Structure formats: C-alpha cells, structure tokens
C-alpha cells in the first residue's frame, strides 16, 4: 500500500525522490543485464574453475577493501555455510582475507597496508588454490600485489573489477569488469550479483542442487 505524503505539495520532494529511486534501480538493473550478456561465459568459466578446485581439495581466498572487503566476506560465507536453505551440502573452504583485525593491523603497521593481503596469501594459499580479488577501480594496490604474488606461488587468480579493469585485470586468469565509473555503488551491486550466481553454479556443478 502506497502512503501519501501529508506535507504541502512539493515541499518534501516526494516525486523527485521517487524518480531518483527509479533512476538508480533501473540503471543498476541495466548494468547487471549488460554484464550478464557480455560475460556469461566468463562467469561460467569462473564457477567451473572454483568447482574443480574444491573437488581437488583446494580452497578459495578472497580479498578486497572497504565495501569490496564486505563482499569478499559475504561470498566466503555463502561457500562455507550455505547459499540457499534448500540445498544441503558439505561446507566448501573459502577464506576472506579481510576479516582478521589483528592480522590486518599488524600487517599494516609492520609491513604497510599494500602488503597485507600478500602476507595472508602467503600464509593460507597453496599451489592450486584460487585467489579472488575484488576492486571497483581495478587499481587497489593491496589487491594487485596479492594477485601478483598468488600467481608466482601457483594459485589461480580471478577478479571482479570495475571501469576498464585497471592495473589488476592483466593479473587475473579470468575477470568480470563492470563497465561503470565514477562511483563504487553500482559496481558493488553487480559484483555481489555475479558472486551469488557463481556460488549457485558451483553447487550445481558439484551435484549439490
């Protein structure tokens, strides 16, 4: 049920705000559609790589900063706990590198923040594992360095990026780049949508659907 505004006409900007809601949400939907149509094959390939890694006893590491750190943690939880209550399966090993406050602050203090995810990848990553880097700009130094290190260590690398992919894209075996610049919000919305689809695909590929 739609509630009517009781203020004098126009004083609360109701119609203007409703137009903003439509503009933002419809643009977000169009952006997701653009990514889906352009990169559906890449998304399927990412899911296949992750499923193969889990089957072989490997794990997934994820890293990002700010909202991307939250997205990394969100997706790790979907793997380790569950995605949908209708699917019953074992836990799948995924670790968000942005969740340990002591490790993050010690690394930032002793090594510099750009080296934090490198150090954690060194601690937890093994050849054959996967590191997923999330960066709305495609240029986050800490994520870039972690992906560079991961490749040298023998990990596979995936990335969810924005803009033109930035400096990180060449260091990812597979990357989904959201074609948006100027703000992180719409990119993050696409990243979490892509991540959810990947988790669902992994479950299906592993026979848990």
UniProtKB/Swiss-Prot annotation:
**Keywords in alphabetical order:** Carbohydrate metabolism, Cytoplasm, Isomerase, Metal-binding, Zinc
| A GO BP entry | D-glycero-D-manno-heptose 7-phosphate biosynthetic process
Q: Where in the cell is it found?
A: Cytoplasm
How is its cofactor bound, per UniProt?
A: Binds 1 zinc ion per subunit.
InterPro entries assigned to the protein according to its UniProt record, in alphabetical order: GmhA/DiaA, Phosphoheptose_Isoase, SIS_dom, SIS_dom_sf, SIS_GmhA/DiaA_subfam
Q: What else is known?
A: The reaction produces a racemic mixture of D-glycero-alpha-D-manno-heptose 7-phosphate and D-glycero-beta-D-manno-heptose 7-phosphate.
Biological or metabolic pathway of the protein: Carbohydrate biosynthesis; D-glycero-D-manno-heptose 7-phosphate biosynthesis; D-glycero-alpha-D-manno-heptose 7-phosphate and D-glycero-beta-D-manno-heptose 7-phosphate from sedoheptulose 7-phosphate: step 1/1
Q: What is its main location?
A: cytoplasm
Q: What is the lineage of its organism?
A: Bacteria, Pseudomonadati, Chlorobiota, Chlorobiia, Chlorobiales
Instruction: Tell me what this protein is called.
Output: Phosphoheptose isomerase
Gene responsible for this protein: gmhA
Natural source organism:
Chlorobaculum tepidum (strain ATCC 49652 / DSM 12025 / NBRC 103806 / TLS)
Question: For binding Zn(2+), which residues are annotated in this chain's numbering?
Answer: 74, 78, 188, 196
Which positions does UniProt annotate for substrate binding?
Answer: 65-67, 78, 109-110, 135-137, 140, 188
> E.C. number, please?
5.3.1.28
Function text? Catalyzes the isomerization of sedoheptulose 7-phosphate in D-glycero-D-manno-heptose 7-phosphate.
SUPFAM superfamilies membership: SIS domain
Required cofactors, per record?
Zn(2+)
Name a Pfam family for this protein.
Answer: SIS_2
What family, per the record?
Belongs to the SIS family. GmhA subfamily.
Show the catalytic activity: 2 D-sedoheptulose 7-phosphate = D-glycero-alpha-D-manno-heptose 7-phosphate + D-glycero-beta-D-manno-heptose 7-phosphate
Q: Name one GO cellular component term.
A: cytoplasm
GO terms, molecular function: carbohydrate derivative binding; D-sedoheptulose 7-phosphate isomerase activity; zinc ion binding
């Amino acid at each position: 049920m739609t509630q009517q505004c009781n203020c004098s006409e126009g004083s609360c900007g109701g119609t203007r705000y409703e137009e903003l809601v439509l503009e933002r949400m419809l643009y977000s939907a169009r952006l997701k559609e653009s990514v889906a149509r352009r990169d559906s094959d890449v998304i399927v390939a990412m899911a296949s790589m992750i499923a193969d890694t889990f089957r072989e006893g490997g794990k997934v590491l994820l890293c990002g900063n700010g909202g991307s750190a939250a997205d990394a943690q969100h997706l790790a939880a979907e793997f380790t706990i569950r995605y949908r209550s209708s699917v019953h399966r074992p836990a799948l090993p995924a670790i968000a590198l942005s969740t340990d406050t002591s490790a993050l602050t010690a690394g930032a203090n002793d090594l510099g923040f750009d080296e934090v995810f490198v150090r954690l990848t060194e601690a937890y990553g093994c050849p054959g594992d996967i590191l997923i880097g999330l960066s709305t700009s495609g240029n986050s130094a800490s994520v870039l360095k972690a992906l560079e290190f991961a490749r040298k260590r023998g990990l596979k690398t995936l990335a969810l990026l924005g803009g033109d992919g930035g400096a990180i894209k060449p260091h990812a075996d597979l990357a989904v780049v959201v074609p948006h610049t100027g703000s992180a919000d719409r990119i993050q919305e696409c990243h979490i949508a892509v991540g959810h689809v990947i988790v669902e695909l992994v479950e299906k590929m592993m026979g848990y659907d």
